Amino acid sequence: MLDRLVSQRTKLTTYFVLNFLSVFFASYVSFKAVVFFSAYIFGIWFYSHKLKRVPFLGNFVSATLAIAPFFAVFVYYKNFDTVIFVHALFLFLLILAREMIKDLENMAGDMAQNYKTIPILYGAKFSKICISILIGLTLVPSFLLIEYFDVGYMYIYFIGCIFLLLGFLVLLVKSNSKKHYVWLHNILKLIIILGVFSILLINVDLVLNRIL
């Protein structure tokens, strides 16, 4: 859709302008910020040109790049609390599962483009097994964040995630068409979007004090 609406030249121009602006504004923060965003931009380029078509590694790098900006600020301020890494693990596993669902969803197009994705090389059944393992692993940090860490009212979100992920696993077993994979993809996207808004629940009193 985007390829039909926007020319390649426009996309490249926008890409370079936005990257330049991100590095420019980062220079006002610190030299470390410039290094981080420069490395991040290079990582995106390297992934899109060299790693995107590599099964397993491409999915892993894509998920890593997706979570990197969210946790860079904690690294910058040297905040290495365990709860942050558990949150990062939860998000990483969720995004990695989403990347693999996208491969199932786009099998026909990837075959036409001669992409060697996991479901094309090893079959949809193998991909489902891998996704099931990832979702099972995602349940672990969800449980840890509920039982062992103070996440305020965000525990409600993680309880909801457990039920959604269990439902996801049931639907995954029964899925056998692109329509089913789109639904599964949307479930994971919903969990991620709700997670962003649920950050406000970590400390409701603090948020209310800032607003009022």
Predicted regions and their residues:
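Multi-pass alpha-helical membrane architecture of UbiA-family
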Residues: 1-212
